[in-house]
A protein has these predicted regions:
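Transmembrane helices of ABC transporter permease
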Residues: 13, 17-30, 41, 65, ...
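An intracellular "coupling" helix at the cytosolic face of ABC transporter transmembrane type-1 domains
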Residues: 13-16, 104-105, 121-130, 134, ...
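Helix-loop-helix
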Residues: 50-57, 150-164, 234-308, 312-313
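Extended hydrophobic secondary-structure segments
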Residues: 20, 35, 39-42, 76, ...
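ABC-type nucleotide-binding domain
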Residues: 327-583
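Membrane-integrated ABC transporters
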Residues: 1-35, 39, 47-63, 72, ...
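Short intracellular "coupling" helices and adjacent cytoplasmic loop segments at the cytosolic face
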Residues: 49-50, 85, 93-117, 121-123, ...
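Hydrophobic/aromatic residues in alpha-helical transmembrane segments
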Residues: 35, 39, 76, 80, ...
Length: 583
């Protein structure tokens, strides 16, 4: 219940609408409670004597009460809808804001499809709990106690008959809830799996088409779809027992009341009108119990969703800004002091092991190594996307953990291995680097990244629509736009994570020439091609998470066997310094 309490705390801004809705339910119940008493007078006084005045008067009162109950019901719907939708919007916003604070380590705890489900399906469950569950939650106990009170006033002995049904109904409800509760967890997990399959298929739709794997993907989707159908069917199988079981008990109680009530009428201990009113109250009481059982099942499902939502809201970011942070990075110098790192405490071995490096400000550093050498892992520690497990990473002479996260990451520009662009225009995407950049600044960055070559051929230039995920440009064009976007940050440290692999060597040469002019920026270039790093001030060779060698192109070519092997496998040339290369 603590999960529900925590999640429902987001209803606080909508307490006025909530209280008005609850009050209107009370008023509606009062009007509905009056109607059977009016009907009793009509049956006992108006019908036997054929007194039309009594019939019209009591009938008019019943109609007025019914209309007023309808109006209060409609007003309730308005206020409840406003509270429920505001509550759902607040939940989604809180979850999304928390996601923006998550670090990579936090995101490792949740799958992307699960996070999507928690922000959509689970929030919708909570919305429905308020929008459709509030009325019966308030109405059922009010109708129950008011109905019991009115029935007791009419005939105390007859009231005992349907009071006997209460423990029976409670036992049925308890049994159903114990069965259904765990099944809702499985159902939501199945929704996660379905969303994951759909997301993966849509993301990789071009590969699916290229490899003609549509039938295979259909089979994979059918598997998770069947899993969801089976989980939903199992849940429904128990939840649906609620209505017929309660109806069976309810109708049995009504038959008993009719039999005993008929005897009371025959012995002049009760009138026909009183029995009619009594039956109305009995139906209201039993319906309220049925409503309450439905609300209980809804709350059981809401509890599952609340637990999943709370897990996101209470996830503590793995990285945090210190209490008294350094607000600016002095320069682009970088130091790794005996740094080791593993992605999780349970990992069997370190991804990086005892790395020690000094990179002066303004230097150009190439980083090479085989697949899995931890090149990307190394540079991710610089903007503090992860914290080192042991050792110290410094930028600008200060431990990265002493900086404000925003200040540190603003000072570090990363061109990712995977080129990420967003829906919108090219201008919108470039302004991620500098929201206030004018067209002249944007074009200057594009020229440095050689993106102007294709932008000038586009009719709309910077206003060209990128399409979803940048589908309207090629891989090489994406890379150049990503480079331009990062240059617009004017960072002190610039990291290229194999980010020129999709451009031709001539274009790469132009980009390297433009970057060479950025003498006050420290540049780290992760590359597979020797030509991308051979002019660097320093080349770092990583092997299995360890620094194998550090030196210039000439030094490594003369002294390091791994570098010599990489060089020999990629090119043939006349000079050991790499000049006169034939490609």
């Amino acid at each position: 219940m603590q999960d529900l309490k925590h999640v429902f705390s987001y209803l606080k801004p909508y307490r006025r609408d909530l209280f008005l809705a609850v009050g209107l339910v009370f008023v509606e119940c009062i009007f509905e409670m009056v109607i059977p008493m009016l009907m009793s007078d009509l049956v006992d006084q108006g019908v036997p004597s054929h007194d039309m005045q009594v019939i019209m008067l009591q009938g008019s009162k019943m109609i007025i009460c019914a209309v007023l109950a309808l109006i209060t019901g409609l007003l309730y719907a308005r206020f409840a809808a406003r509270a429920a939708n505001g509550f759902a919007a607040a939940l989604r916003e809180a979850e999304y804001r928390m996601l923006q604070q998550f670090d990579f380590a936090n995101l490792d705890h949740f799958s992307t499809p699960s996070l999507v489900t928690r922000m959509t399906t689970d929030v919708t469950v909570m919305l429905n709990a308020v929008a459709t569950g509030l009325r019966p939650l308030v109405r059922s106990p009010v109708m129950l106690f008011m109905g019991l009170g009115m029935a007791f006033l009419l005939n105390a002995k007859l009231t005992i008959v349907f009071l006997i049904t209460t423990p029976i109904l409670a036992a049925i409800l308890a049994w159903i809830v114990t069965k259904v509760g765990p099944l809702y967890d499985r159902q939501q997990t199945a929704v996660d799996h379905l969303n994951g399959r759909v997301q993966e298929a849509l993301t990789a739709i071009r590969a699916i088409k290229a490899f003609v794997r549509g039938d295979y993907e259909n089979e994979q989707f059918e598997t998770v779809n069947d899993e969801l159908a089976a989980a939903s069917t199992n849940t429904f199988r128990y939840a649906v027992l609620n209505l017929p079981a309660f109806q069976a008990v309810m109708y049995t109680a009504i038959v008993c009341i009719m039999w005993y009530g008929g005897n009371f009428i025959l012995t002049d201990r009760m009138t026909v009108g009183e029995l009619t009113a009594f039956l109305s109250y009995v139906l209201q009481v039993l319906n309220s119990v049925m409503m309450f059982s439905g609300v209980f099942l809804q709350l059981t499902r809401s509890l599952t969703s609340a637990r999943r939502i709370r897990a996101v809201l209470e996830e503590q970011p793995a990285l945090a800004t210190p209490a008294d942070p350094i607000a600016a990075v002095a320069d682009g110098s970088i130091d790794f002091a005996d740094v080791s790192f593993k992605y999780s405490a349970a990992a069997a071995r370190d991804a990086l092991s005892h790395v020690t490096l000094h990179i002066p400000a303004g230097a150009t550093v190439g980083i090479i190594g085989g697949t899995g050498a931890a090149k990307t892992t190394l540079v991710q520690l610089i903007p503090r996307l992860y914290d080192a497990t042991s050792g110290t990473v410094k930028v600008g002479g200060q431990d990265v953990r002493r900086y404000s996260l925003a200040a540190l990451r603003d000072a570090v520009g990363i061109v990712l291995q995977k080129n990420l662009l967003f829906s919108g225009t090219i201008r919108d995407n470039l302004r991620w680097g500098d929201p206030n950049a004018d067209d002249e600044t944007l074009w200057a960055a594009c020229r440095a990244a050689c993106a102007d070559e294709f932008l000038e051929r586009m009719p709309d230039g910077l206003d060209t629509d990128m399409g979803q995920g940048g589908v309207n440009v090629s891989g090489g064009q994406k890379q150049r736009l990503c480079i331009a976007r990062t240059l617009l940050k004017h960072p002190k440290v610039l990291i290229f994570d194999d980010s020129t692999s999709a451009v031709d060597t001539a274009t790469e040469g132009k980009i390297r020439h433009a970057l060479a002019a950025l003498t006050d920026v420290t540049k780290l270039i992760i590359a597979q091609r020797i030509t991308s790093v051979m002019d660097a001030d320093m080349i770092v060779i990583l092997d299995d998470g360890k620094v194998h060698a550090v030196g210039t192109h000439k030094e490594l070519l003369a002294n390091d066997t791994i570098y010599q092997e990489i060089y020999a496998s990629q090119m043939k040339g006349d000079d050991a310094d790499g000049k006169g290369i034939q490609r």
